[in-house]
């Protein structure tokens, strides 16, 4: 039985969407147990495979991450992370404060021996519906070439086991596709990735090609990765806003909007990265998944489903074995 620790109070719409997502998840899968951490008075789920763990504190979006983890010992997120550290559960998922969850992963659960820097990875949509994994998205603003090689190794294992890609391709985010393009970090990383035989490195990829499925995995430093993510997210949101404004501009366009409303919703859902689950924190000694802060129940369900798959494939053991050669 897979045991998943859930922070009941993480996210903009907690605890309602968290509980709704859990109910969907327990109904869909019978090989999982949920360990719910939060205020027991706010839990409305009575299920034989759900265990409630009462906590008295909450980490908010405004809290300073490391300070909150160290001072709020009875916070739902901290207690959930501790359960993974103590091997009482297999994974933790939260839609709460991203920095705090990363801090909980590092300082409560702990880093895998041999991993120098953790990385936050998220699967983003592509035009062909396959999606690609981007990392690092902000766990570390600065990185060395060796760190990016480790990112590529971890993501390759994950893509193979979780997404069923037999030989996932790895691209390096850069300002051009030529071998010598980019700053010193990009050039040095390119050379190391090219020499690494355990991954399928295909070279540099430009940001304009990402949504066209340039690679299964794209690695970069956390500063650049976060900029790419925010740019893609903002561009998609603004395109839909402009499209909506155009379609509501006149009677003629309103009629057209009514005719293609279903198709537009399908397109919007296609570009919603929460359809792929949450972001995974690579490099810590346990499965840590960050659901989107504004998740609805389906997005939280997808994050739980992602956790289940990672636990079923024993991803952490594989990372230890293949990345650190333990």
Swiss-Prot record:
Coiled-coil intervals: none
Superkingdom, taxonomy of origin: Bacteria
Pfam families, per database record: FA_synthesis
Tagged with keyword Cell inner membrane: no
Residues of the signal peptide: none
Alphabetical keyword list: Cytoplasm, Lipid biosynthesis, Lipid metabolism, Phospholipid biosynthesis, Phospholipid metabolism, Transferase
Record localization: Cytoplasm
Catalysed reaction, written as an equation: a fatty acyl-[ACP] + phosphate = an acyl phosphate + holo-[ACP]
Enzyme class: transferase
GO BP term, example: phospholipid biosynthetic process
Pathway(s) it belongs to: Lipid metabolism; phospholipid metabolism
Cellular component per GO, a single term: cytoplasm
EC number: 2.3.1.274
SUPFAM superfamilies recorded: Isocitrate/Isopropylmalate dehydrogenase-like
UniProt main location, coarse: cytoplasm
Recorded family membership: Belongs to the PlsX family.
NCBIfam families membership: plsX
Oligomer status and interactors: Homodimer. Probably interacts with PlsY.
Cross-referenced HAMAP family: PlsX
Protein name: Phosphate acyltransferase
Species, as recorded: Macrococcus caseolyticus (strain JCSC5402)
